[in-house]
Swiss-Prot record:
It holds the Pfam family TLE_N. Ubiquitinated by XIAP/BIRC4. It is found in: Nucleus. This is Amino-terminal enhancer of split. Residues 166-197 are annotated as: CCN domain. Monomer. GO terms for molecular function: transcription corepressor activity.
Amino acid sequence: MMFPQSSSRHSGSSHMPQQLKFTTSDSCDRIKDEFQLLQAQYHSLKLECDKLAGEKSEMQRHYVMYYEMSYGLNIEMHKQAEIVKRLHGICAQVLPYLSQEHQQQVLGAIERAKQVTAPELNSIIRQLQVHQLSQLQALALPLTSLPMGLQAPSLPISASSGLLSLSALGSQGHLPKEDKNGHEGDRRPDDDGDKSD
């Protein structure tokens, strides 16, 4: 009776290490698979983060470029406004020295110069658009060396958005140019009048 019990004990003890060995190996395989899955997810997330970082740097470059362009346009608008003020002051100083007939002609020309029609304004905006696009392309040339294929199509959109802001200030920035042209046209009859006198 003792021998079967000892044999059953030996068989049970020999079976347990095999079962433990099998479960440990299976657990290691599962851990390895999960680790590989996590590593693949980490790699994909790292690639996505690198892509987002590249897009962020591109947006920062565009922001700096547009800020510099906007600042330059603002300075130019103030410069043109100051030029118009000075030219208007010169006209006001010269006007009393003209004859009565020439004064009426000059005043009429000044009033006509202040009345800018929509077609004239559209023509001015188109000229500014061509000029701004050439400037944008010149500024964007160093940036196009990067692998960003969406830069070239985005230039007209940004230019049009800049023109929308310019159109709101058109009465302040573009009318002075017309006034200046009007004053230049007004000086010609004045000069003729001076020559005739």
